[in-house]
Amino acid sequence: MEKIDFVLTWVDGSDPDWLAQRREYQPGRGTDAGESRYRDWDNLQYWFRGVEKFAPWVNKIYFVTWGHVPKWLNTAHEKIQIVKHEDFMAPAYLPTFNINSIELNLHRIKGLSEHFVFFNDDMFLIDSVRPEDFFKNGFPCDCCIETALVQDNIRNPFANILMNDAALVNMHYNKKEVIKKQAKKWFSPAYGAMLFRNVLMLPYREFSSFKYSHLPSPFLKATYLKVWDEEGAVLDEVCKNRFRTVFDVNQYVMKYWQYMEGKFTPQSPKLGRFYTIGKHDQQIHHTIRRQACKMICLNDDVNVGDFEKQKKEIQRSFEVIFPEKSSFEM
């Protein structure tokens, strides 16, 4: 079986040096630089415990950081590779406080396997996963569900970014031809009832958007190379935005390209769950403690209430399934 690497991005939002640099590049209008995008929930150790316990087969872990690392992290571990932004990103893109810029350059990480899984630091493994949960027959496992794009927050640029992702693939691919060529994957029973969304979206001439799971994403490096080759000017422009903007595309454009090319294996959408802290607190604690799925995303939000209280409660839930330190911790 091919080697599979994990890539994890992390920022210590309390680092005074990082904060000082960030203040030098105050975001302009149309950017998103809210505090909740950078604050540390002090739960990263549970990410590593989850990997050691539930994905011991992983080849390497590329820990992508501005430069800081947690004091407790065992950087001498044979599976850990610390990667600073300047190690793989062009000088013209640095310094960056834009996760989209970082995500779009992951394929440039030295030594990264062709098959890799990308994690944000709010995504955790909470039960056993197999390589086949991420790749089958050499292709990423994914849930390709077309959906209508809606927005309920005029100040959140995320919907704009998703629209940009879809626009870019629509410039290169004909929807009717793509679906005809990939019909078995487009209407796979693996999607359950959600496959009917693909049926309902058939009358529309172009792709609107796709269901986003906010869960670990498997990628082929070859996809990144192809998109950069075909739309390098657009990606270069995005990567020069130091903060996230409404004009960006993100890593989902790589997912969409894999859909268009048929380079994916249909997968059930029930593999993991996405929750927002402060909105789904009961579900969060139940899911973690009962290990109700294989992976979970804990989305930060400005309206979490008492931050310190929420942080401690989440830590207590993780301690139920991860009471012991991993070999990634000193």
Regions found by a protein language model. Give the residues of each.
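ER/Golgi luminal nucleotide-sugar-dependent glycosyltransferases, focusing on the catalytic module
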Residues: 1-117, 124-330
